[in-house]
């Protein structure tokens, strides 16, 4: 089942850099979207709250390597920036 919201369209405003970097962020964003959809039935990133992204980082990625967590963390930051919740995200990470 493919998530219905288009992550490429959602992240277009914040994606910068080389083509390979943009593709990595898009692939990871789609995996984040699928995990959140499976857990909370929310496929539209505009409906996500910070708790959903926090769960992904702290819960879903707990068994992944530090390298993977780092790169997924960069993608999560892009999503947070696109949602306009950077200030709240910084407060949650303290």
Where do the PLM segments sit?
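Short terminal alpha-helical segments
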Residues: 1-18
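Short, intrinsically disordered, charge-balanced linker/junction segments flanking boundaries
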Residues: 92-94
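Non-catalytic DNA-binding core/recognition domains of DNA-processing enzymes
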Residues: 15-90
């Amino acid at each position: 089942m493919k998530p219905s919201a288009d992550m490429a369209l959602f992240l277009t405003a914040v994606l910068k850099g080389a083509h390979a970097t943009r593709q990595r962020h898009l692939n990871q964003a789609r995996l984040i979207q699928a995990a959140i959809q499976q857990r909370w039935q929310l496929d539209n990133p505009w409906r996500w709250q910070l708790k959903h992204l926090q769960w992904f980082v702290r819960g879903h990625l707990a068994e992944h390597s530090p390298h993977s967590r780092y790169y997924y963390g960069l993608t999560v930051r892009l999503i947070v920036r696109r949602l306009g919740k950077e200030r709240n995200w910084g407060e949650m990470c303290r």
